[in-house]
Amino acid sequence: MRELLEKIAAEGEVVADGVLKVDRFLNHQVDPHLMKRIGEEFAAQFHRERPTKVLTLESSGISPALMAAYELGVPLVVARKRRPLTMTSEVYCAEVYSFTKKETNEIIVSRPLLDSSDRVLIIDDFLANGQAALGMVEVVRQAGADVVGIGIVIEKAFQDGGRLLRSQGFRVVSLARIASLSDGVIRFHEEVMS
């Protein structure tokens, strides 16, 4: 997605080896026009799979996932990292390790929100090692539902997450694929391939 690549190139910042900061448009301050375009692109990519729900993990995945759900005309389910007092029903849960934050979180979804009739599209902001996506896959499987695809805004293609998910048979669509963040330079996958 050209518009996203341009935004990453202009406003993304490599803050450490393997860490890309995009908080000016994706996960701290959000560019609503870009999120709308991202939602449209995910809807175009996945509408044939007929998802009945979009699932994301709080909090950075919410903006692109909401726009994708809106464009697809389906509800958005947000997996929580902490169980709020208002979540009184039984839950589906999975453990997810964050390499960025160096911590393990239990993600939870209230059982009434997913069931075996659902066709779930997973959307997330980043894909690095694949742990967040695999945690969401586990939650969907616990519900007896089907994962119809995984949409990623930015994939760190130099890490194993994309290969891991694709090797398990998931259709993964990444709108931007980063080949390298070495030496503080953002290199897109297409640049390396050509």
Swiss-Prot record:
Q: Name one GO biological process term.
A: purine ribonucleoside salvage
Q: Record-annotated residues binding xanthine?
A: 20, 27, 156
Q: Name one Pfam family in it.
A: Pribosyltran
GO cellular-component term (any): cytoplasm
Positions that bind 5-phospho-alpha-D-ribose 1-diphosphate: 128-132
Highest taxon of the lineage: Bacteria
Catalytic activity from the UniProt record: XMP + diphosphate = xanthine + 5-phospho-alpha-D-ribose 1-diphosphate
EC numbers on record: 2.4.2.22
Q: Which UniProt keywords apply?
A: Cytoplasm, Glycosyltransferase, Purine salvage, Transferase
- Its EC top class is transferase
Its annotated pathway?
Purine metabolism; XMP biosynthesis via salvage pathway; XMP from xanthine: step 1/1
Q: Where can this protein be found?
A: Cytoplasm
Query: Does the keyword field hold Ribosomal protein?
Result: no
One GO term in the molecular function aspect is: xanthine phosphoribosyltransferase activity
What is the role of the protein in this entry? Converts the preformed base xanthine, a product of nucleic acid breakdown, to xanthosine 5'-monophosphate (XMP), so it can be reused for RNA or DNA synthesis.
Assembly notes: Homodimer.
Q: So what family is this one in?
A: Belongs to the purine/pyrimidine phosphoribosyltransferase family. Xpt subfamily.
User: What protein am I looking at?
Assistant: Xanthine phosphoribosyltransferase
Q: What is the lineage of its organism?
A: Bacteria, Bacillati, Bacillota, Bacilli, Bacillales
Q: Report the gene name.
A: xpt
